[in-house]
């Protein structure tokens, strides 16, 4: 505020030193008509240019707003579509999970069933092989026992069996076969 007062005092002092302060109302001497014409022309041309500039700017702003609104609508549409696709994808994922769980249960059940069947088949096969091996071993043991018995009888008969006794045994067996 002090600077304002000081500046006002300085201007007043300068005007007082110059002599007088006043308005020159002589329009020709003061070139007032030219100033008014120039001011009017500037106002007319400036207002037209300013109006055009403002109108152009307004159109750009309106265009930008409309473009933004269109983009917003497109974004909302895309968002809605994306949400629908997400919901569908979640349904598909849920469905796939359920199918996978059901398939896993079926596969597990199938594997267990197949495993049990395979175990039963292997058990039956093993029992059959054991039975076959037992029969083979019994046959071999029987053959061995018969062989040993024949060897023993042969050894016993070699000392007791003469040609007449052998002929009688052969004749008996032949008569049995004929009869």
From Swiss-Prot:
Question: Any stretches that span the bilayer, and where are they?
Answer: 35-51
MF terms (GO), sorted A to Z:
proton-transporting ATP synthase activity, rotational mechanism
Topology with respect to the bilayer: Single-pass membrane protein
Q: Which CDD domains match?
A: ATP-synt_Fo_b (cd06503)
Q: Record's InterPro entries?
A: ATP_synth_b/b'su_bac/chlpt (IPR002146)
For whether the record's keyword set contains Ion transport, the answer is: yes
Q: Does the keyword Chloroplast apply?
A: yes
Q: Which domain of life is it from?
A: Eukaryota
Keywords in alphabetical order:
ATP synthesis, CF(0), Chloroplast, Hydrogen ion transport, Ion transport, Membrane, Plastid, Thylakoid, Transmembrane, Transmembrane helix, Transport
Provide one Gene Ontology cellular component.
chloroplast thylakoid membrane
What compartments host this protein?
Plastid, Chloroplast thylakoid membrane
| Pfam families (alphabetical) | ATP-synt_B (PF00430)
Record family assignment: Belongs to the ATPase B chain family.
Q: What does this protein do?
A: F(1)F(0) ATP synthase produces ATP from ADP in the presence of a proton or sodium gradient. F-type ATPases consist of two structural domains, F(1) containing the extramembraneous catalytic core and F(0) containing the membrane proton channel, linked together by a central stalk and a peripheral stalk. During catalysis, ATP synthesis in the catalytic domain of F(1) is coupled via a rotary mechanism of the central stalk subunits to proton translocation.
On assembly, the entry states: F-type ATPases have 2 components, F(1) - the catalytic core - and F(0) - the membrane proton channel. F(1) has five subunits: alpha(3), beta(3), gamma(1), delta(1), epsilon(1). F(0) has four main subunits: a(1), b(1), b'(1) and c(10-14). The alpha and beta chains form an alternating ring which encloses part of the gamma chain. F(1) is attached to F(0) by a central stalk formed by the gamma and epsilon chains, while a peripheral stalk is formed by the delta, b and b' chains.
- PANTHER family hit by this protein: ATP SYNTHASE SUBUNIT B, CHLOROPLASTIC
Additional comments on file? In plastids the F-type ATPase is also known as CF(1)CF(0).
Protein name per its UniProtKB record = ATP synthase subunit b, chloroplastic
**Native source species:** Emiliania huxleyi
Q: Which gene encodes it?
A: atpF
């Amino acid at each position: 505020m002090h600077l304002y007062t000081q500046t006002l005092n300085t201007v007043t002092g300068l005007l007082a030193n110059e002599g007088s302060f006043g308005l020159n109302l002589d329009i020709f001497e003061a070139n007032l008509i030219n100033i008014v014409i120039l001011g009017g022309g500037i106002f007319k041309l400036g207002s037209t240019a300013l109006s055009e500039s403002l109108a152009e700017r307004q159109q750009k702003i309106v265009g930008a707003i409309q473009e933004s609104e269109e983009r917003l609508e497109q974004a909302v549409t895309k968002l809605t579509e994306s949400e629908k696709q997400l919901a569908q994808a979640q349904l598909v994922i849920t469905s796939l999970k359920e199918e996978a769980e059901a398939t896993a249960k079926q596969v597990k059940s199938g594997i267990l069933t197949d495993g049990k069947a395979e175990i039963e088949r292997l058990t039956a096969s093993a029992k059959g092989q054991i039975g076959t091996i037992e029969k083979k071993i019994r046959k071999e043991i029987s053959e061995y026992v018969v062989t040993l018995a024949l060897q023993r009888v042969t050894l016993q008969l070699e000392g007791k069996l003469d040609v007449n006794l052998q002929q009688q045994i052969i004749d008996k067996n032949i008569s049995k076969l004929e009869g």
